């Protein structure tokens, strides 16, 4: 589980020459696709060591939908029906920090993964499978670079404009009273 992995990383020697310069365990983010997105929701609700959380094409578990998440939160998804979008926005509206709903147009459930590179049945006509991966990677990189470096106060325009086409974004503020 995600907590086990983070605990094992903390067990590594801090003077390790290979990992020391690239691994800052005070600024850990977590991302997950589909069922892994539910894992992200649970991990973030139970472990404040995750400083930013990203879910690809899913909504968090039922318990977290009622309470929200306290860390900066990103949902990166394909187009959904109105009822599912309303459910997501209700969840994101319960955030204790900031939350973003980013819709990658001309995408499907698998567009942020490498599956369309290998499985023709999930490819979208006229859409290069690599472009979905590149767009998602750019968005995730910008999100984590911003929200893991304590730039929350200036993080209204963190999305990499010009690098990612066909994106819609909606921002949610912290819960009232926070």
Task: Please report, for each region that a protein language model flagged, where it lies by residue.
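Alpha/beta-hydrolase active-site loop
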Residues: 1-25
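Divalent metal-coordination and catalytic microenvironments
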Residues: 2, 28, 101, 144
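Sec-exported extracytoplasmic/periplasmic mature domains
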Residues: 7-14, 45, 145-149
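Residue in the alpha/beta-hydrolase core beta-strand immediately N-terminal to the catalytic nucleophile
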Residues: 17, 27-29, 52-54
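Gly/Ala-rich beta-loop-alpha elbow adjacent to hydrolase catalytic centers
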Residues: 31-36, 40
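Conserved hydrolase catalytic core segment
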Residues: 42-51
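The feature captures the conserved acid-bearing segment of alpha/beta-hydrolase catalytic domains
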Residues: 51-112
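Alpha/beta-hydrolase-fold serine-hydrolase catalytic core, especially in secreted/extracellular enzymes
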Residues: 106-108, 115-178
């Amino acid at each position: 589980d995600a907590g086990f992995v983070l605990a094992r990383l903390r067990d590594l020697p801090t003077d390790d020459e290979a990992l020391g310069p690239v691994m800052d365990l005070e600024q850990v983010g977590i991302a997950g696709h589909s069922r892994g997105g539910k894992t992200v929701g649970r991990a973030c609700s139970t472990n404040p060591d995750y400083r930013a959380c990203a879910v690809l094409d899913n909504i968090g578990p039922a318990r977290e939908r009622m309470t929200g998440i306290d860390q900066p939160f990103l949902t990166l998804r394909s187009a959904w029906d109105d009822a599912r979008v309303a459910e997501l926005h209700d969840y994101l509206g319960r955030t204790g920090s900031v939350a973003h709903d980013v819709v990658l147009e001309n995408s499907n459930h698998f567009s942020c993964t490498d599956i369309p590179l290998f499985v023709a049945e999930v490819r979208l006509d006229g859409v290069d499978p690599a472009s979905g991966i590149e767009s998602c990677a750019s968005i995730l990189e910008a999100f984590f670079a911003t929200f893991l470096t304590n730039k929350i106060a200036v993080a209204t325009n963190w999305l990499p404009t010009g690098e990612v086409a066909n994106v819609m974004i909606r921002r949610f503020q912290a819960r009232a009273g926070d």
